[in-house]
Amino acid sequence: MSNFKNIIPKRTYLERGQAKHRLHLGELEKKVDYGKRREIYKKKKKIENVLKEKIMTKNPDEFHTGMVHSRVTEDNVLVREEKVLKKEVQLKNKRQELKEQTNDLYNKLKKINKRLSNYQMNIPLRYVFNNSHELYNENEIYTLKAENKKLKKRGDLIQKKYNGLINMKKNLLDQIRKLDNKYITTYHKVDGYNIVTDKGKTPYRLYQPRLK
């Protein structure tokens, strides 16, 4: 008989909603929220019990390999010793860092040179920057000025961008000159600059890309 009772569809009872005058007390917790909170609490409790057991069964004279390269200070702070690398490995790492720095700087310089050449090739700078053009006749000189305000604004913007690119180029060249270049040599001059090694040092040959 009980099996037949379960077949008959019954009304599904919804959970009670929260009244508006009690919203200031916070959201009403539903059964799903309680289940999630219960699972999280049980997980934390398990971890806590495992850690408690470890502390209770810990041997004070226990040794592990991490103690060789680390120590605990009076303030109970763990201090680890730095790894001592061979000179060959240190030189290799230094060369790799310098190689990455120089490549990055030269790539940036190449992009700036390309943009500058585009400005010079595609835009007649003397017309746009000065906003004037001189016409020579047999006896007289005429100056034609751009009266259009939009053209003047455009010319000023292009001039600012052009000057900014030149300043960026100067800064990049200064950064390249300031690099610690004891172990790097370049065989291509870039804008009249070439890296030279110190005497007696073993150079690391780094071939840089050709630039204008």
UniProtKB/Swiss-Prot annotation:
Keyword ATP-binding: no
SUPFAM superfamilies linked to this entry: OmpH-like
GO cellular component, one term: small-subunit processome
Keywords attached to this entry: Nucleus, rRNA processing
Similarity comment: Belongs to the UTP11 family.
Subunit-level organization: Component of the ribosomal small subunit (SSU) processome.
Protein name: Probable U3 small nucleolar RNA-associated protein 11
Organism: Plasmodium falciparum (isolate 3D7)
